[in-house]
Amino acid sequence: MLLDGGILSTSVLGQRVAGVDEVGRGPLAGPVIAGAVILDPECPISGVKDSKQLTAPARERLAALIQAQAVAWALGRAEAAEIDQFNILQASLLAMERAISALSVVPDLVLVDGKHCPPTVCPVRAIVKGDQQIMAIGAASIVAKVARDAEMIAFEESYPGYGFGIHKGYPTRAHLAALKALGPCSIHRRSFRPVRRFLEA
């Protein structure tokens, strides 16, 4: 389904189409998480769009609807250590691959947001700005964003003082100040330049 209300049927010619997107490429800490969603063409979900265009309450409401009504949905992740090991692009593709593999229904076609396709046994196509065009990709971005935000909020208790629940690991002024005062913790991405700078100081 297209987000403008037109149809790129979620079952193109009877095929099961999975939308895939990741969140968390830009933060200095925490995992990158990918969502994979196969929507039910008989149950369109109003309001689905790129997760960045939604408020947190709207994302949470839509994530619950997506999880309840989708044919299948799943999450995949790559940890900070894997991001440091492989680089953020390869870690993002790994998270996508894991999300696709975790689906309870095998898709006939996978549509991925962006320019790069993850390795998968299914036919896959990358669509630039797909999260703004394809409903299943928008849905994937929503479930991934809600899951990652919840995890970063939970890290507040494990790693007090960094403000992860507020900035979600992104390089805000407050986060950089906390890094300077406390140094990196175990979920920081040591290969990212701002974190590496504090490690080398």
Swiss-Prot record:
UniProt subcellular location: Cytoplasm
Cofactors (names): Mn(2+); Mg(2+)
SUPFAM superfamilies xrefs: Ribonuclease H-like
Residues annotated as binding a divalent metal cation: D21, E22, D113
Superkingdom assignment: Bacteria
Gene Ontology CC terms, in alphabetical order: cytoplasm; ribonuclease H2 complex
Protein name: Ribonuclease HII
Native organism: Nitrosococcus oceani (strain ATCC 19707 / BCRC 17464 / JCM 30415 / NCIMB 11848 / C-107)
Lineage: Bacteria, Pseudomonadati, Pseudomonadota, Gammaproteobacteria, Chromatiales
